[in-house]
């Protein structure tokens, strides 16, 4: 599988690289992020006090979300497989303490509730780069560049990826409700993924990509 750089023109329809974010805004987050654990598998913390409490976190959040309430969390671990793809109603921002790889596709490539994994592209994100992932971009937990794993800040509007609301039991069957999973989280699963076994909507067809061997 070819791995592009987020600096390549191929990334432009998936997101933006914010090269001009002052280091005084990113360095405190990176220092705190570097101290978070890197487990086997992957772990996601939606709202992490150790990141949200650093100097000027409020300024970084305002820069990204323009005054909307936001959350700074992290996704760390070891992973090489696609498994699922998700999207939100707003952009997501990532910042890695280590290099990492994003597997992405476009929402408009979904046809009749299905997406062929042949559409998925891989992009390497250098450590220390702020990357905006558009709300029209399907994504999921990162993949690792090496055996050291990944440590990635995940910034989103507050409440995103939160518990599934009780109101979801009465959600109308319309639009993209078929793949709704949690608060502001819509997910397409591969049949071979753990989330599919939990009842997630199986919407990825084709190979469950693995960057270690594909």
Identify the residue ranges that each predicted region occupies.
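Active-site region of the double-stranded beta-helix
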Residues: 1-127, 138-214
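Aromatic-residue-lined binding/catalytic grooves and analogous aromatic/hydrophobic interfacial grooves
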Residues: 133
């Amino acid at each position: 599988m070819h791995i592009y750089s987020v600096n390549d023109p191929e990334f432009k329809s998936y997101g933006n690289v914010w090269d001009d974010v002052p280091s005084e805004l990113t360095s405190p987050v990176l220092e705190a992020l570097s101290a978070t654990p890197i487990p086997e598998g992957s772990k996601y913390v939606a709202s992490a006090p150790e990141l949200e409490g650093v100097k000027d976190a409020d300024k970084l959040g305002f820069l990204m979300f323009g005054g909307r309430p936001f959350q700074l969390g992290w996704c760390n671990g070891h992973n090489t497989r696609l498994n699922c793809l998700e999207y939100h109603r707003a952009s997501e921002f990532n910042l890695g303490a280590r290099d990492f790889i994003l597997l992405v596709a476009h929402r408009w490539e979904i046809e009749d509730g299905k997406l062929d994994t042949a559409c998925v592209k891989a992009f390497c994100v250098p450590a220390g780069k702020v990357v905006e992932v558009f709300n029209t971009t399907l994504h999921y937990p990162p993949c690792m560049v090496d055996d050291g794993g990944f440590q990635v800040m995940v910034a989103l509007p507050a409440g995103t990826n939160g518990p599934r609301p009780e109101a979801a039991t009465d959600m109308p069957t319309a639009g993209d409700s078929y793949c709704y999973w949690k608060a502001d989280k819509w997910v397409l699963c591969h049949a071979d993924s753990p989330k599919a076994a939990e009842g997630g909507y199986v919407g990825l067809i084709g190979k469950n990509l693995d960057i270690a061997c594909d």
